[in-house]
């Protein structure tokens, strides 16, 4: 097996980056592609009381255990199996269980700050930024956090105004300059997704 192709997909919360990642993932046989979500690598917070965990800024680079993520990606590149963490968004902490991820020809790394960390960036063969209007992103975030993460409307809106938007402007938006490809309109941009798939297939044939 050759060195895996690592693809980084980033963008603001609710931008459609997960949709783009899934669209690309679904274009390949499951035996040759793996998905690594940066959200799985939020730091372990077992030593912090739940009330304090609820107040933490989860859109700041310091919230992520990028050291572990980078180590896991290097292991996959070296064709080693990893144990990917599982994060519980209601408890704001890692679960004890992990998910075994085996090396694949294609590794997708998806998350809001994938292009922010220089050490993480340099591992990526293709860097994608998904660009979507802020109004669309906040609506998607609202629906996701209420339906999938057990949040209230007030808490989501408050978090967006005080944390999510400022962090987007400070860290996520500036990382766009490191992207090889910028995809507007998220997962609805079928042409861009098809072009990416063709490019990945070309890299695999080298």
Curated annotation (Swiss-Prot):
EC number: 2.7.1.48
A single MF term (Gene Ontology): ATP binding
A cellular component term, taken from the record's GO annotations: cytoplasm
Gene Ontology biological-process entries: CTP salvage; UMP salvage
A Pfam family of this chain: PRK
InterPro entries referenced in this protein's UniProt entry, alphabetically: P-loop_NTPase (IPR027417), PRK/URK (IPR006083), Uridine_kinase (IPR026008), Uridine_kinase-like (IPR000764)
Subcellular locations according to the entry: Cytoplasm
Biological pathway: Pyrimidine metabolism; CTP biosynthesis via salvage pathway; CTP from cytidine: step 1/3; Pyrimidine metabolism; UMP biosynthesis via salvage pathway; UMP from uridine: step 1/1
The keyword Nucleotide-binding is annotated on this UniProt entry: yes
Keyword annotations: ATP-binding, Cytoplasm, Kinase, Nucleotide-binding, Transferase
Family: Belongs to the uridine kinase family.
PANTHER family according to UniProt: URIDINE KINASE
Protein name: Uridine kinase
């Amino acid at each position: 097996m050759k060195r895996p192709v690592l693809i980084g997909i980033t963008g603001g919360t609710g931008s459609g980056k997960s949709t783009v990642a899934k669209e690309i993932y679904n274009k390949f046989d499951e035996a040759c592609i793996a998905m690594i979500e940066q959200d799985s690598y939020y730091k372990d917070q077992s030593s912090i009381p739940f009330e304090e965990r609820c107040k933490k800024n989860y859109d700041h680079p310091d919230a992520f255990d990028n050291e572990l993520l980078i180590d896991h990606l290097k292991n996959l590149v070296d064709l080693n199996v990893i144990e990917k963490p599982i994060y519980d968004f209601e408890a704001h902490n890692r679960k004890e269980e992990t998910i075994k991820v085996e090396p694949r020809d294609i590794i997708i790394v998806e998350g809001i700050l994938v292009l922010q960390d220089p050490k993480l960036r340099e591992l990526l063969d293709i860097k994608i930024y998904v660009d979507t209007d802020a109004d669309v992103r906040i609506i998607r975030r609202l629906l996701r956090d209420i339906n999938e993460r057990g949040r209230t409307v007030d808490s989501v809106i408050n978090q967006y105004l005080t944390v999510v938007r400022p962090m987007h402007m400070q860290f996520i938006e500036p990382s766009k300059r490191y992207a090889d490809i910028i995809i507007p309109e998220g997962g609805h941009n079928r042409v861009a997704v098809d072009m990416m798939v063709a490019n990945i297939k070309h890299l695999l044939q080298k």
